[in-house]
Amino acid sequence: MVGWSGNPLFDLFKLPEEHNELRATIRALAEKEIAPHAADVDQRARFPEEALAALNASGFNAIHVPEEYGGQGADSVAACIVIEEVARVDASASLIPAVNKLGTMGLILRGSEELKKQVLPSLAAEGAMASYALSEREAGSDAASMRTRAKADGDDWILNGFKCWITNGGKSTWYTVMAVTDPDKGANGISAFIVHKDDEGFSIGPKEKKLGIKGSPTTELYFDKCRIPGDRIIGEPGTGFKTALATLDHTRPTIGAQAVGIAQGALDAAIVYTKDRKQFGESISTFQSIQFMLADMAMKVEAARLIVYAAAARAERGEPDLGFISAASKCFASDIAMEVTTDAVQLFGGAGYTSDFPVERFMRDAKITQIYEGTNQIQRVVMSRALLR
């Protein structure tokens, strides 16, 4: 037994070296290829093409795709690290790897081998993107009340209806779509399908005008007698809602990772600014009130990072009952991101309220992490049900 003076081989809560190397690599790429364009992407509400090109070239656009389909087969913690480091400089760009995972996780978990071979290699090798279509205007938190329908027609499926709040809508090649196949069975009458952007009867609505993540288009999807091949169903008919929930169990930590990255970016900017800013003849970082704010911000970010990585690790191990920890990681990290970015703006004073500095963008971008993939109120419902069942 090693003495209490310290054991350098004790690796509990310590990431493997390959994860640290991954962080260094993606951070360097993000700072060089993505950060210089982040302000312009936000101000012009344009898609971060530079980020997409850099992520595609490095293989970080869909690092989660298994090796047997041409991907890197990175684990869930590695995927979170990539998303976190990109979000640290540009939250919109971080939605490229994040939503590629969201849009394909149901397929990876429940899809047929043939369908996986049809879809996944295009993300890994061709730079295709994927999106996830669950919500509708009148079926948000109550997703099971969706009205989009899918009906068998010979060897095909015909989809009718629409979806809303689709991240990267119009940029993705593939869409995982939930639709009702048996209205009499409620949630057990929902099925999951893969729709291609060129499928007959499928179209994209206009981009939403948003508070934040302006570089990532958010659109509606329209299905007007949209015909897709019969083999593009994920799993068996009636299992789609379960697939949707299983997907979110695996991907909510990625939104937590995005939130951690946003918060870290704001904290980093605040540290630099407070050290440089002088009032009363000295750096404001020498004032105890400022020091305490920075300390609290850093403490919260570190705690959020740990719960996100813990949730991702449990998902990677395939542990059962992921609902609580997955919801907790997303909920806690996103609440922290909103707190930390707000404090960062405060530390900048009036300058922080302008677009001359990135913290106002971080603050606007942070808000959505409390909303998408289930509002934080719904996350608390998920957690409380897990506690009380």
UniProtKB/Swiss-Prot annotation:
It catalyses: a 2,3-saturated acyl-CoA + A = a 2,3-dehydroacyl-CoA + AH2. GO terms for molecular function: acyl-CoA dehydrogenase activity; flavin adenine dinucleotide binding. SUPFAM superfamilies: Acyl-CoA dehydrogenase C-terminal domain-like, Acyl-CoA dehydrogenase NM domain-like. The keyword RNA-binding does not apply. Its EC number is 1.3.99.-. Its cofactor is FAD. Keywords: FAD, Flavoprotein, Oxidoreductase. The keyword Zinc does not apply. It is an enzyme of class 1 (oxidoreductase). Pfam families: Acyl-CoA_dh_1, Acyl-CoA_dh_M, Acyl-CoA_dh_N. Belongs to the acyl-CoA dehydrogenase family. This is Probable acyl-CoA dehydrogenase fadE25. The lineage of its organism: Bacteria, Bacillati, Actinomycetota, Actinomycetes, Mycobacteriales.
